[in-house]
């Protein structure tokens, strides 16, 4: 193009050529300014993801540690934790969604700073009584072996943030263990508005923008530490729905209201039964993960059904899936949840962490868990599923049958995103209402 412009300039008279060249020079000058401005804008955008807080572990390579492959004991205790936490998190007639893995990772990091009765209770709730050392080894290997591909991405990130305050000492062994097993950077920060921005920026970056913040407003003056996990699941279906597969349908909500939804139809081949519910398994691309849906039988209340679920029952249902011909209908849906897990975890058996806690392996201060905040997001459509989760532990100082099976998810149902290698739910939720 530039060669053509030069050729045309050569045919212009000298006087006109001078005028023309002035115009060209102005255009070039304007273009250079625009390019510089564009580069500055890009630079500003790129820098917005930077963390201002000081990472005390930057440049330090985590120590080599031993891991353990998921076995029957780990799968059983993890499934038990997942279903108990799910049962405790369902409230009223609202949609729910949790990531048991995200909550477990954040609490396991926290448990590395616990001792005495506080540690015993956390070990019982998180690992069915296994030591935190064993749990670290299992989770270390599990995180590293979770498959992640272009069409079925799973990413995990952990971080620790603590207040830069005179006299507040965080134990080096606590930070080292969480760096070794959970690859968690340790940020020393002022806990002012810039720290709020840093933490929320970290959350957004590590959930692909699905969750943009975990802290609203100012940080309480008694808050000394945050231990945070972020998890992303983004996968295409093994067989993406075509336009012809999507039709309007009616979804009957828990409160009896009826709403029009986009219902996606497909033929599935894995049938599951779990207690008073039947459902299907739908694979994601690559076959490493699946979507499991459970529709309670007619006349069975969804909340009663959820209350009857057990970890053993869920894993057995998954493992005993049968081949069958299923006409499945799945509604498109998208929603987010924000839950405080305090009451759920206390009810599950770890009250000491929230009351008279012993976190002497974490710091020289008298500390306790003031809040376990869990935020999730999910979107299910014809392409696949996007889901994100963030768990923040806030630490304060004291102050198959015969024939074709029809399964239409047109009323409240339970679903899970499952790791096919272990049968463990990475996410588990319940849809009680959809529509406008």
Go through each PLM region and give its residues.
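C-terminal, non-catalytic macromolecule-binding modules
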Residues: 311-314, 345
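Residues that cap or delimit alpha-helices
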Residues: 115, 307-312
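Extended hydrophobic
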Residues: 227, 278-294, 401-436
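Non-catalytic, conformational "gating/processing" segments within enzyme and secreted inhibitor domains
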Residues: 52, 93, 132-299, 304, ...
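Detector for small/aliphatic-rich hydrophobic stretches
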Residues: 17-191
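Short, Lys/Arg-enriched N-terminal segments with co-localized hydrophobic residues
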Residues: 1-20
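Short, positively charged
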Residues: 75-85, 385-404
């Amino acid at each position: 193009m530039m060669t053509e412009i030069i050729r045309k300039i050569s045919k212009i008279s000298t006087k006109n050529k001078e005028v023309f060249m002035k115009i060209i020079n102005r255009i070039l000058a304007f273009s250079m300014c625009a390019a510089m401005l564009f580069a500055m804008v890009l630079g500003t955008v790129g820098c917005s993801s930077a963390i201002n807080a000081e990472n005390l572990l930057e440049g330090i390579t985590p120590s080599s540690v031993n891991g353990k492959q998921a076995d029957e004991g780990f799968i059983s205790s993890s499934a038990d934790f997942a279903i108990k936490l799910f049962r405790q998190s369902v409230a009223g007639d609202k949609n729910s969604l949790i990531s048991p893995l995200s909550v477990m990772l954040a609490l396991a990091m926290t448990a590395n700073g616990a001792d005495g009765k506080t540690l015993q209770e956390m070990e019982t709730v998180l690992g069915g009584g296994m030591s935190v050392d064993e749990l670290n080894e299992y989770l270390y290997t599990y995180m590293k072996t979770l498959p992640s591909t272009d069409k079925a991405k799973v990413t995990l990130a952990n971080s620790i943030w603590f207040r830069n305050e005179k006299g507040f000492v965080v134990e080096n062994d606590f930070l080292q263990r969480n760096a070794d097993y959970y690859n968690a950077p340790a940020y020393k920060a002022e806990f002012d508005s810039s720290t709020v921005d840093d933490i929320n920026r970290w959350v957004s970056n590590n959930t692909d923008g699905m969750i943009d913040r975990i802290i609203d407003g100012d940080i309480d003056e008694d808050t000394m530490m945050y231990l945070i996990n972020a998890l992303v699941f983004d996968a295409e279906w093994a067989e993406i729905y075509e336009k012809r597969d999507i039709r309007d349908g009616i979804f009957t909500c828990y409160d009896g209201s009826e709403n029009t939804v986009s219902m996606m139809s497909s033929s599935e081949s894995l049938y599951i039964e779990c207690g008073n519910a039947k459902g299907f398994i739908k694979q994601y691309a690559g076959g490493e993960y699946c979507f499991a849906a459970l529709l309670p039988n007619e006349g069975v209340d969804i909340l009663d059904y959820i209350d009857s679920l057990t970890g053993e029952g869920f894993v057995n249902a998954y493992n005993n899936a049968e081949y069958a011909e299923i006409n499945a209908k799945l509604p498109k849906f998208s929603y987010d949840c924000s839950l405080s897990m305090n009451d759920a975890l206390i009810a599950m058996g770890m009250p000491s962490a929230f009351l008279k806690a012993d976190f002497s392996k974490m710091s020289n201060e008298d500390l306790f868990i003031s809040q376990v905040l869990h935020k999730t997001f999910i979107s299910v459509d014809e392409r696949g599923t996007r889901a994100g989760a963030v768990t923040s532990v806030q630490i304060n100082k004291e102050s198959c049958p015969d024939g074709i099976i029809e399964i239409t998810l047109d009323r409240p149902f339970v679903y899970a995103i499952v790791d096919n290698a272990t049968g463990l739910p990475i996410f588990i939720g319940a849809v009680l209402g959809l529509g406008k």
